[in-house]
């Protein structure tokens, strides 16, 4: 029998030490990984609730187990809030992750061997958009488009040429490292020209879309997916959205359950419901605008300090810094910044001479630092510190000096006050 007073402390101190160390790292380090953010304590409360005990295979009102009358209400709240937030007619809140959501879309709307046209991972796309190492690149005939290496922008004429040439069943629009605004009307035009479905993965910019600061793909896409963390600041999970289409809705539901998953994670769905409610609050737009302002301010500093920012700047929450001209690797830069308590991720850049495990670039994003309360002033200072480390890569004194300043800044802007 369990007690309400049961705690990890005193029972599994080795695990607790690792958990506490990670929480302290989050407080003491500046987080600039574009896909990371901090959830509210409300989201954490939902995820740590008794809902974790409930199995609920199926959908609200159509479960395979009894005792689901309360979790039905939880899922219904999440669905309705997601639809309201994005102007969707359909929402499935059960995918365990963004990759799970993408896999369900492919399972629902494609047959093995069908052709998909997606953005190359090497040019800013995502693994699930047809990369050879992903199931999306193994189960389907994946053709890849990229960016114009001179402008750093997607070449839509090239996308159209490839579409006409390969006649894809589906075109995938989305990215993990592209800093400019996607042209959804143009993607729709290309898809219609070749009779393809248009699938948009807006995982990185969903928060900006919800705030009205980035174009909403719903009017143009046959189906849209997103994660619920990143710019949405919710729990780690996935979401599928669409406009009204009974045939597609049935296929999507069947692909998620029983096609790809069994029981949904009801405690995570509750966390999603909380984050959707938070995103509907008036202050959410101001937060997202600050995310963009901070990213643009940081990118400007890198450009002024002589670093190449792919695409020449950013319209969203992230940007990619190429270190090719400096002869540096992303791996070494990532490690040096980590020693100064600044967390980024190494990232491939167009025409990268290095392997994906070394790379010649850094991806930098501002959602997490903005959640901490950083404004443009702090972000400009932070970008300067990063450039100082890159200018003097491997200099322990520079790293120590920056680490000391990072410590003071983190103390002024705690994650949880």
Swiss-Prot record:
CDD domains: SHMT (cd00378). It is an enzyme of class 2 (transferase). Keywords: Amino-acid biosynthesis, Cytoplasm, One-carbon metabolism, Pyridoxal phosphate, Transferase. GO terms for biological process: glycine biosynthetic process from serine; tetrahydrofolate interconversion. Catalyzes the reversible interconversion of serine and glycine with tetrahydrofolate (THF) serving as the one-carbon carrier. This reaction serves as the major source of one-carbon groups required for the biosynthesis of purines, thymidylate, methionine, and other important biomolecules. Also exhibits THF-independent aldolase activity toward beta-hydroxyamino acids, producing glycine and aldehydes, via a retro-aldol mechanism. NCBIfam families: PRK00011.1. Belongs to the SHMT family. This is Serine hydroxymethyltransferase 3. It comes from Pseudomonas fluorescens (strain Pf0-1).
